């Protein structure tokens, strides 16, 4: 299986608790538009393998295309990019590479601000069997929030 052993994250980022159940990625310093935030590597796995992973681990699998996903290499090596939460008005966006996802700042980001991305483009793929895992109520607070996020 193709594998990228390490993920990168900007030294300007850290993982913090968002509430009693969730964590998110936050800026520890100001970030300029266009700065690379994270490069998330891992293992490329077929859909059938995703369904065999522990339920809590499946949420870290990114759909790539044609029934393949990028999964973290292990539970102990989950990069910060896998922890970005959804927002309908994100401040980060991803550039998909062969074996990695690169998140960049879509605008200037203030110190202390949570780094978010929009999950909806990833839901527009060709893999309808994975879609039930990607259904949730968005509470981002954006005035044009999509509400229920689903493929």
Q: Where are the model-predicted features located?
A:
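Catalytic cores of histone-lysine modification enzymes
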Residues: 2-93
């Amino acid at each position: 299986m193709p594998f990228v052993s390490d993920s990168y994250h900007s030294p300007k980022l850290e993982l913090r608790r968002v509430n009693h159940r969730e964590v998110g990625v936050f800026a520890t310093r100001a970030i300029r538009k266009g700065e690379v935030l994270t490069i998330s590597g891992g293992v490329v796995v077929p859909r059938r393998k995703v369904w065999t992973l522990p339920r809590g681990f499946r949420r870290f699998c990114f759909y790539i295309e044609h029934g393949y996903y990028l999964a973290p290499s292990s539970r102990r090596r989950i990069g910060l990019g896998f922890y970005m939460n959804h927002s309908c008005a994100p401040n980060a966006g991803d550039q998909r590479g062969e074996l990695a996802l690169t998140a960049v700042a879509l605008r200037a980001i203030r110190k202390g601000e949570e780094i978010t991305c929009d999950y909806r483009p990833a839901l527009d793929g060709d893999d309808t069997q994975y879609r039930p895992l990607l259904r949730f109520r968005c509470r981002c607070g954006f005035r044009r929030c999509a509400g229920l996020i689903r493929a």
